[in-house]
Each structure stands twice: as C-alpha cells, then as structure tokens.
Amino acid sequence: MAENLANHLLDEMIEALSSLPGIGRKSAFRISFHLLRLEQGLFNQFIHQLTDTKNKIKFCKRCGSYAETEICEICVSEKRDSHTFCVVEQPEDIFFIENTREFQGKYHVLNGVISPLEGIGPRDLRIKELLERIEPEQVKEVLIATNPTLEGDATADYLANQLKPISVNVTRIAYGITVGGSIELADQYTLGRAIRSRLQL
C-alpha cells in the first residue's frame, strides 16, 4: 500500500513539473528526486520562497509588467528615458531585453498578440492602454518588440497603423532575431544587435 502510494505521489509530482515550459518528463523526474533528497529545512525554504513570490508579485498598473508594488521600478525610475517605449508581448520579454543593457526607455506589455485562429483580437490586448499613455507621458518613440512570427508581425503592423495619426516615431526590433524565433531564446548579443538595428515602420 505504502509503495503504491509513494509511486502515485511521485507520478503526480513528475506530472506537475513536466507541465512547466522547457521541462520534459526526464528533467521532471530528476528534479522530483532532487527535491525529495533535500534537507527538510532547505526544502521548506524553497517552498516558502515559491509561495511568497507567487503571493506578492502582481502586475504593474501602468506598463503591465511584474511588480512588487502597484507601479514597477522601471516606470517610476527617473533614470529611464520616459519618451521612449518598448512594446513587448509578455512581461518576461522585458527581463531578456534588460539583460542586453541596450534599451534605457520604458515598457508596455500587450499580454499577447493578435491571433484570429485563437480568437484573439486587438481588443483582447492592452493596446488601448498603450494609446492612452502616449500623450500624457509625452512619448516620442515606440519600439515594437513583438516576436518575428506571423502573429507578431500582424500585431506590429496593427500597432503601427494605430500610432500613425499620433506624432510619434514608430520603430521595430530588427536584425538578429530569426523568423519564427522568439526573444526568450535569443542570446544577449543577438538581442542587443536587434535593438540597435531597429527599423522605421
């Protein structure tokens, strides 16, 4: 009975871990046994950190990125170029761009891309919120950093058309990111070069 219970619990743990992006069943298997071998104090600390992070991290009310407060550190920073916005698909894209140290402006998260096949249209994204920020924050350039996919391209084109009537320079992240690739998988050099080589839309 105990043996079956242990196997059942392990299977559930492995299944839960393998549902995470980038973790296959073999990796989930190794992680599960590593966690079981952890000293109880370290294990409790690990679980506490996960729970604490999940409970305290929220979305910035201004840009939509992850934040510990209502407005994130980048949005309130006076050291950032508040006249330049970088528009990304997801909050995690900001972390990869920040690692390049090439972009010194502020961000806006769309929370996805236009995808008719999945029933996602412009109204399902944070496009309205972006347009509402342009004039009050005196934005002069919007760098569109959507992924070079069909959906990312369609979203970039839509944004460019929406921003045309406004007196703002619209650019897009360029060379270095392969078509069909993603910002998350690009190395710092490639992503940095893409930011430096952004194109006028």
UniProtKB/Swiss-Prot annotation:
<comment type="similarity">
    <text>Belongs to the RecR family.</text>
</comment>
<keyword id="KW-0863">Zinc-finger</keyword>
<dbReference type="Pfam" id="PF21176">
    <property type="entry name" value="RecR_HhH"/>
</dbReference>
<keyword id="KW-0479">Metal-binding</keyword>
<protein>
    <recommendedName>
        <fullName>Recombination protein RecR</fullName>
    </recommendedName>
</protein>
<dbReference type="Pfam" id="PF02132">
    <property type="entry name" value="RecR_ZnF"/>
</dbReference>
<dbReference type="GO" id="GO:0006302">
    <property type="term" value="P:double-strand break repair"/>
</dbReference>
<keyword id="KW-0234">DNA repair</keyword>
<dbReference type="InterPro" id="IPR015967">
    <property type="entry name" value="Rcmb_RecR_Znf"/>
</dbReference>
<feature type="zinc finger region" description="C4-type">
    <location>
        <begin position="60"/>
        <end position="75"/>
    </location>
</feature>
<keyword id="KW-0227">DNA damage</keyword>
<keyword id="KW-0862">Zinc</keyword>
<feature type="domain" description="Toprim">
    <location>
        <begin position="83"/>
        <end position="178"/>
    </location>
</feature>
<dbReference type="InterPro" id="IPR000093">
    <property type="entry name" value="DNA_Rcmb_RecR"/>
</dbReference>
<dbReference type="GO" id="GO:0000725">
    <property type="term" value="P:recombinational repair"/>
</dbReference>
<dbReference type="InterPro" id="IPR034137">
    <property type="entry name" value="TOPRIM_RecR"/>
</dbReference>
<dbReference type="Pfam" id="PF13662">
    <property type="entry name" value="Toprim_4"/>
</dbReference>
<dbReference type="InterPro" id="IPR006171">
    <property type="entry name" value="TOPRIM_dom"/>
</dbReference>
<keyword id="KW-0233">DNA recombination</keyword>
<dbReference type="GO" id="GO:0003677">
    <property type="term" value="F:DNA binding"/>
</dbReference>
<comment type="function">
    <text>May play a role in DNA repair. It seems to be involved in an RecBC-independent recombinational process of DNA repair. It may act with RecF and RecO.</text>
</comment>
<dbReference type="GO" id="GO:0008270">
    <property type="term" value="F:zinc ion binding"/>
</dbReference>
<dbReference type="InterPro" id="IPR023627">
    <property type="entry name" value="Rcmb_RecR"/>
</dbReference>
